[in-house]
């Protein structure tokens, strides 16, 4: 196995998920940044020929930059393990846990982390009476999410029975299970985790979007539609608690190397944990690189560090 600047690094991106386009943008950025440290960086499309392409490239380490299933849910990670290839990021189990919001919330609850109240609606169970029961239990301000999508794909808000039924129907286009949560009013906050000697919480980021909008797919990936405030202007106790919960969520899922933990933080009280992303976006508008930069870790150094960790595990 080659080490140092002579290591062959394969950046795998793209695929067929709803987030494939974002993945390609992230992948190009990662590959360009890695080229500052490593002489041999190849970019490989995640398609039916990915195995053949990896065998031809003979990488010393793989850097998956894949968003959504089947690249982020443990499937590709398991494939790499069958090939005996070291890779950046969380392993099979943690990737699968994090991608499924229902499973992840079960693990977070077991760890005693602060969560929004929720209900799970599965395909074939979305009867009017069942949805009425969800409204009665959670109240009229709801967030509806496909269980296994990222980048806010398929997410809708609902206030009435009709809106809830429409939102659940739309979410079923992406998944067989839908997570319905009470909508908490507060700031949209994210805390990035980077493992060095230990899992370290980077500076907390607040995401601000124009009034009347929220951090949906368009606002995540369109220049100028969102503002990243670093460090997030939270009271000291909330700020510290957000970082603490982020570390605990990373550990609860068994994540490795890096993750991004999303929250809504109300005006007072606990930050509410929403989800953990095991392969955060690495685009020019993404949160994770901004948090790392604020911690004194420029993008080129960040991605090189992640590759070096994977190489160290394999040696």
Predicted region positions:
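ATP-binding N-terminal substructure of ATP-dependent carboxylate-amine bond-forming enzymes
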Residues: 1-93, 97-106, 110, 122-133, ...
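ATP-dependent carboxylate activation and anion-phosphoryl transfer catalytic cores
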Residues: 2-7, 109-112, 235-315
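Glycine-rich phosphate-binding loop of ATP-grasp-fold ATP-dependent ligases
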Residues: 23, 116-120, 142-167, 188-190
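Hydrophobic beta-strand scaffold residues
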Residues: 41, 86-87, 115, 142, ...
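ATP-grasp fold ATP-binding core
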Residues: 108-109, 135-153, 176-185, 189
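Phosphate-binding site of ATP-dependent enzymes
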Residues: 159-244, 265-272
């Amino acid at each position: 196995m080659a080490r140092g600047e002579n290591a062959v690094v394969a950046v795998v991106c793209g695929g067929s998920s709803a987030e494939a386009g974002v993945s390609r943008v992230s992948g190009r950025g990662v590959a360009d940044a890695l080229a500052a440290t490593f002489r041999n960086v190849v970019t490989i499309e995640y398609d039916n020929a990915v195995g053949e392409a990896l065998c031809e490239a003979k990488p010393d380490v793989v850097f998956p930059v894949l968003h959504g299933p089947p690249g982020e849910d443990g499937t590709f990670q398991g494939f790499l393990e069958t090939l005996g290839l070291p890779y950046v990021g969380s392993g099979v189990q943690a990737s699968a846990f994090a991608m499924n919001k229902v499973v992840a919330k079960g693990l977070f609850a077991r760890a005693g982390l602060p969560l929004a109240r929720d209900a799970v609606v599965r395909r074939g169970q979305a009867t009017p009476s069942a949805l009425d029961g969800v409204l009665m239990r959670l109240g009229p301000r709801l967030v509806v999410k496909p269980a296994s999508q990222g980048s806010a794909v398929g997410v809708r808000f609902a206030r009435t029975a009709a809106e809830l039924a429409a939102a659940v129907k739309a979410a079923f286009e992406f998944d067989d299970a839908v997570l319905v949560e009470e909508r908490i009013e507060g700031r949209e906050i994210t805390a990035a985790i980077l493992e060095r000697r230990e899992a370290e919480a980077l500076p907390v980021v607040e995401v601000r979007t124009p009034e009347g909008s929220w951090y949906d797919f368009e606002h995540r990936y369109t220049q100028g539609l969102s503002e990243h405030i670093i460090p997030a202007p939270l009271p000291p106790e909330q700020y510290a608690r957000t970082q603490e919960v982020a570390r605990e969520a990373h550990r609860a899922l068994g994540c490795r190397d890096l993750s991004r933990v999303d929250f809504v933080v109300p005006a007072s009280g606990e930050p509410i944990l929403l989800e953990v992303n095991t392969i955060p976006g690495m685009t020019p508008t993404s949160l994770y690189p901004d948090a790392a930069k604020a911690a004194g870790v420029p993008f080129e150094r960040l991605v090189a560090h992640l590759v070096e960790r994977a190489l160290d595990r394999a040696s």
